[in-house]
């Protein structure tokens, strides 16, 4: 029986490249001239520090743009609380890796509510979808890909015929 897995993974090599491009852009931007600002990547977390809240927002926007250029979905990015220490503002940006159980249940429920002739089952941090026909699997892929309510980007992996 044909099957595929629904996963949610972020390519951290591309994230590192986007952070490096953002740091390069930070050095050339006029509005960041003579300003203590930095953007670093360390163990799946991007740390952003600046002198003001507005500049922090600008740096996050630069990062989002560079992530989009590197084809990393911005929905996988979650910005943590902004912290002010002395005259510096800082925030951490984390990336969703894997499908949480609540989201996996929503995916399975969405597929079952569509009344497609497929079976969806949760297997750890991925959802396996099986069917008798390849066309049914492709319909399930389109359904999950176009569903905005799930709030997380998905990739389709391990397609077997």
UniProtKB/Swiss-Prot annotation:
The organism's place on the tree of life at top rank: Bacteria
Pfam families: DUF520
Signal peptide: none
GO molecular function: nucleotide binding
UniProt cross-references to InterPro entries, sorted A to Z: DUF520, UPF0234-like_C, UPF0234_N, YajQ-like_sf
GO cellular component terms, A-Z: cytosol
Keywords assigned: Nucleotide-binding
Family from the record: Belongs to the YajQ family.
Function: Nucleotide-binding protein.
Protein's name according to its UniProt entry: Nucleotide-binding protein PBPRA2024
Organism, scientific name: Photobacterium profundum (strain SS9)
